[in-house]
């Protein structure tokens, strides 16, 4: 059913404002007129609004709905004159079929919202006008733009100092972390070294002649103790040395040292062979040069040498001569200048039935310390094992000149008995030892002191004193005499000059005198 229009034609707008009014007078929207149900009656509100819009061809008026009363309000806008005329027309034409709610809008927004008024004075006729059309403040147009900061010279200096201080703090912090990590590594390395050097020590040596001699007879041990006391283990030098000891294998360190001294050792061996003819007391061979090493490395090597010496002495006292030879050989690689190590290894070789090796070690011990009583005794025992009784008797006589030696007197008596038997047989010496004599003998018995001793069929293999603590290094030459040996092991026995057979009875006479004195 089509609505019945109440009126036809344009609606007469009784607006008090005219287009000719000055802008400053009508800059703000003014309420012109209100429309209610009594104005459009039964007419369709859409048709009424269309006629209302057509009555304002210049687009100076806007229609709003009062939220409180629900009446239509006609507002007058002079600032849209000439600026939004065309836009108002196009908007009115496009919104004709959309009802009153879509009239005069752009994308759902009123033109009054898109283009706010230029003055902030609200309309005096309606209190809702100020809320519907908010005023534009000058502060909205004054946008704060970013500006370049102007820094003074004092401020720049202060900022520079702060940056430098912060950088220094970061450097100090990094340095502290580095030092802390370094200390932790040093502490761990020191613990590993102490754990390595603090291996289970050998059982305490039994009392007897085989115990190490006292301090006057142990100059090497005294020197080691003094050197260890003089070292400051907390110093940086010692810590660096210990680090090198922990990183380098022992064999590599020793081989490096041995490569630096082969020439000196060869000269010492030649001079020792040339001076064999003179009495042992007059021998003064040139000792081989020492390996240049730092105090820290020397202290660690000496400590390991002492540990291996104790182990070797313990094995020798219990009759394990093969194992003792291995330990003494390892100890000699760490401390090749200790004459006691060669004497103890000579003792083990003599007990194993290897007189040639025993003679070589005894000669080296006397080279390192000429006139050493235990070295002379070991030399005599090795000569007895080689059936060279006349030379052995001369060595035992030299030993007795240094003081009372019951063992030397007993061995001298045995040598004289062998020489007497040879003289009765027409001066024919006993045949040399067979190759089997160099092998260890299986028979063993306990000596009076409780130490096992080997029974030798050709000589009285009595227990000989003089075992000393030795040091450590891996190599074994006891079971492979034909293989190339290290420089400390490659010394072959130098044949002593045989004496005139006519002097044999002189030796017997001197031997009897020494035997009577020893008793």
UniProtKB/Swiss-Prot annotation:
TPR repeat feature ranges: 305-338, 339-372, 373-406
Superkingdom of the organism of origin: Eukaryota
Pfam families cross-referenced by the UniProt entry: TPR_16
UniProt feature, compositional bias: Basic residues: 175-187
Disulfide pattern: none
Residue ranges with Polar residues bias: 481-490
Coiled coil: 147-197
UniProt region (Disordered), positions on chain: 175-230, 253-294, 474-506
Keyword field: Coiled coil, Phosphoprotein, Repeat, TPR repeat
Keyword Transmembrane helix appears in the UniProt entry: no
Annotated SUPFAM superfamilies: TPR-like
Residues recorded as bearing Phosphoserine in the entry: 278
The protein's name in its UniProt record: Tetratricopeptide repeat protein 31
Species per Swiss-Prot/TrEMBL record: Homo sapiens (Human)
